[in-house]
């Protein structure tokens, strides 16, 4: 399925009963977040608030509030099909030459999709139908949501921040929350390992004291939005991956005030710069952990231009204790991760990030164990192979007879196959999300690996237990007479 823009996607969702329009006046201050939270928790539809209190612009929430809508946004019917996207990413990350003509023919569909990777640059774009500059710029006129009563200010949540480092050809798209602090000022909260922060760091070294150009797109097409949160290889641009998802090239146009390319169909675009010498104290905000985070200084984004479509839609979300939209995205994108990990570690059978683990803080891996110490190798691989798992605090490794997605199965494996002293691996002084206040130092903490696999010679000197198995003949017999037993 191809969606040229966000509006085409909303039309499809509405036709499937996956979008509800609310005409009643609803306040962006707390009320929208409360309604969105209740709706998401019951697996409800996306919401278009058509009458925000005090504003003329409608607000879209809960767009990716179910795994099904995430899959639809990526052009698939369900989350199971996302495995194929993961296989494509694994292929692009480490392409292998075909071993023969038959394998070459088999790879043609993948290479054909590569033709959709280059962006298509438009001279005229819908996202620039309305242009505001100078004193016309006033962020207070946007219906920016205030999500929790303890939040310090309204927060831009679904903005796609577009940056480019001085030494890179490709541009980076990332989603970083942005605190409103003035009519043309936002605080750009990005962690040091994220693409935008890395671009900014390189810019400051190459261009001391010079403003760093930034554009932020709000309400892009679903493929571009989801490309910004998908674990794509560092060498692949988000626009290129969006083209793969969409099955046609991503249409972009040049920003009015800088050379950055922006999604041509975006609802709203904020353009401006970051002064390397200007920072502000960000937070506190309720975040995906279910707690308010600590305050910290981050760069200030000065907005010089706002461009938008006529009758623009403001796209927003909230974060809080799971389930929330980031947790749902994590659950769906879990299926994309698996083939990427399996390409590097073929012994991995399943990989699961439980939503209640705040999207990425705990992982359960099942493997076909082949030798003593195998579980520890997989732990180290999870922590080091993909940047997305740099902040995963707990990795539990089980055998392939355990269902990684069933806590009863996992806990049984831990309690019967794991000795706390022998099978727990602790690593200190590792990168940790600075929002994790449980770590002793902001940004630096420990990790725990739990080996819940059956132990091999060399891992134990005791005779290992034999699992109880039912007699298949008796099971078949009881199946045949079950309906006669009145049970």
UniProtKB/Swiss-Prot annotation:
Protein known as: 3-octaprenyl-4-hydroxybenzoate carboxy-lyase
Catalytic machinery residues: 287
UniProt keyword tRNA-binding, yes or no: no
Membrane-protein topology: Peripheral membrane protein
UniProt enzyme class: lyase
Pathway the protein acts in: Cofactor biosynthesis; ubiquinone biosynthesis
Cofactor note: Binds 1 prenylated FMN per subunit.
Chain segments annotated as coiled-coil in the UniProt record: none
Compartments (UniProt record): Cell membrane
GO BP field: ubiquinone biosynthetic process
Organism: Actinobacillus pleuropneumoniae serotype 7 (strain AP76)
Quaternary context: Homohexamer.
